[in-house]
Design a protein with these regions (language model features):
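Active-site environment of divalent metal-dependent phosphoester hydrolases
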Residues: 27-29, 51-56, 76-81, 97-99, ...
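Pre-active-site segment of Zn-dependent metallo-hydrolases
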Residues: 10-47, 51, 58-63, 134-163
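Active-site beta-strand termini and strand-to-loop segments that position acidic
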Residues: 13-16, 101, 120-124
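Active-site HxH/HxHxD metal-binding segment of metal-dependent hydrolases
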Residues: 34-98
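Active-site-proximal beta-strand elements of phosphoester/diester hydrolases
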Residues: 2-5, 20-23, 104-110, 127-133, ...
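Active-site-proximal loop/helix segments of hydrolase catalytic cores
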Residues: 112-190
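Active-site neighborhood of phospho(di)ester-bond hydrolases with catalytic His/Asp-centered motifs
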Residues: 21-25, 42-56, 70-75, 129-133, ...
Length: 242
């Protein structure tokens, strides 16, 4: 499985002839453009987990000719930006809904922010999970009441991911939260059966190195991309660079 980092929470995943693009709001390295022009895919699916500007952008409209399906969170349906997209190619998904065609199957899970998380099962049987903005958003300078609400909201939703399988999981490890940046990721890998974790939502912060607390829960390969255009291949056991 080939993985390219776009920016923020944006990634492109290719498995055999299936191309998945997640939360592509900017692509400074031109990764998706290059793949689109090369055309080495049979199916192209573009996902947006929610309507925040750093997850959903109209620039992915330019791929419409070859797109198999745009798969958007249902909150995007109510934005002005989505009106430029061909409605015949859009599927909107609410939390805990499913969608499939003859190539992939998609599950949508709830978030602790707006929108949804996606899990995609590919023809090869491999599974990809993208959390969107689902996380334990613990801000040290917030009020005790809000900190408590954030914890309860996360734990209520993460319980529903217990036993969920994914070969690759994209999950926020947001450097703005300092010592609390791993809280969500630790609880997530403790419950879900994931083979690796890719850190996201950390623009402007250095490479994340898993703490002992994280590794004590699940010793899995991790990747914390730093620069747009970085690439890794995941073989089910480890990441490898070009």
């Amino acid at each position: 499985m080939d993985i390219n980092y776009l920016l923020n929470s944006g990634f492109m995943v290719q498995d055999e002839k299936i191309l998945l693009v997640f939360d592509d709001y900017e692509d400074p390295a031109g990764i998706v453009d290059a793949a689109y022009d090369k055309g080495d895919f049979d199916r192209l699916y573009i996902f947006a987990t929610h309507a925040h500007f750093d997850h959903f952008s109209t620039h992915v409209r330019s791929y419409a000719q070859k797109v198999t399906r745009y798969i958007f969170s249902s909150d995007i349906k109510h934005t002005k930006r989505v009106k430029v997209f061909p409605t015949s190619k859009i599927t909107y998904m609410k939390r805990y809904s499913e969608w499939e065609d003859d190539a992939i199957k998609v599950w949508a899970y709830d978030s602790t922010d707006v929108g949804v998380c996606f899990r995609v099962e590919l023809p090869s049987g491999k599974k990809v999970f993208h959390a969107g903005d689902f996380n334990w958003w613990h801000w040290e300078d917030d009020t005790p009441e809000n900190i408590d609400l954030a914890e309860k909201a996360f734990k209520r939703q993460v319980k529903r991911l217990k036993g969920m399988e994914a070969d690759v999981a994209f999950f926020p490890v947001d450097g703005r939260m300092g010592d609390s940046q791993e809280k969500g990721a630790i609880d997530f890998v403790a419950r879900a059966e994931v083979k690796c974790l890719v850190a996201m939502h950390r623009v402007g912060y250095p490479i994340w190195t898993p703490s002992r607390d994280f590794l004590a829960i699940r010793r899995i390969p991790t990747w914390s991309p730093l620069k747009p255009g970085e690439h890794r291949t995941f073989d089910g056991v480890k990441f490898s660079e070009d």
